[in-house]
């Protein structure tokens, strides 16, 4: 698997393209690219510009689906504690949240329109990790776009991890979509919610074939998780993570890596990537890459799905629904329901 230096650069650093290419395409082959790159923190317009430059490169390699990391638009606030301790929130932490809230995007909104235009312009299915702003609550969200430039929908992370829970809301069962497309059924789960067996089972029941796993986890153990999901679900797993150095975040005292700042230099790696593409048989098709910002691509033979399902179909012939079953509450969970709205809905259904 060659690592090929490309002429263009991003942030004045060389961008690498790691590509595992079949010698020929078939009608059941899809070229997939996962993007391993850092957000331009607190600068959403510049991050969108960077996303477009990366899409140009991916499209030039023939990518049909491109997956970006968790929270690429809006940023993953690695190392920050937002001034929180039990029973106390600091003024500096509240200001940090204000800035983070300002960098998030509305869905729908102008940034979503721009992402739609990018997907259509470069003729790719686009899976983009964003921080979604819904009033004054933020969600870690994945947006889906088709190659015609249409916004398909979103998935909100159902379970933020650890301190993420103080800044992100919890998604509900209404945003666990799997989209039927000409290149396969596409869905996504974000970072550690991929460790939730029931969420994965819901995805499998919806028939996911191209399972996107944007993440912020660059540990070796993450590779075991992605391989297990591919084998369990009989699906391709496309996992994209950011590669970031300390200098990719604002300097102190504006932004502080709690507990580790004194040990970091501007070039210290704070997120090592590890983006990877796994086949339904558990084979590594491309990656993992821990070297720097990269476009990691592979050709997906969709026939591998049927060959894998012959052995193991977790919601089909290898299930025991009369013994073990799952109920998914897939309706929105709104904190307030106005009776006038409910009455109108009831009247319309009579």
Curated annotation (Swiss-Prot):
InterPro entries: C-N_Hydrolase, C-N_Hydrolase_sf, Nitrilase/CN_hydratase_CS, Nitrilases_CHs. The active site is at residues 70, 157, 191. It catalyses: L-asparagine = 3-cyano-L-alanine + H2O; 3-cyano-L-alanine + 2 H2O = L-aspartate + NH4(+). Its EC number is 3.5.5.4, 4.2.1.65. The keyword Kinase does not apply. Keywords: Hydrolase, Lyase. One of its GO terms (biological process) is detoxification of nitrogen compound. Residues 30-302 form the CN hydrolase domain. It holds the Pfam family CN_hydrolase. It comes from the Eukaryota. GO terms for molecular function: 3-cyanoalanine hydratase activity; cyanoalanine nitrilase activity; nitrile hydratase activity. SUPFAM superfamilies: Carbon-nitrogen hydrolase. Highly expressed in leaves and cotyledons, lower expression in stems and roots. Belongs to the carbon-nitrogen hydrolase superfamily. Nitrilase family. Involved in the cyanide detoxification pathway. Has nitrilase and nitrile-hydratase activity in the ratio 3.3:1, producing both asparagine and aspartic acid from beta-cyano-L-alanine (Ala(CN)). Can also use 3-phenylpropionitrile as substrate, but not indole-3-acetonitrile. This is Bifunctional nitrilase/nitrile hydratase NIT4B. The gene is NIT4B.
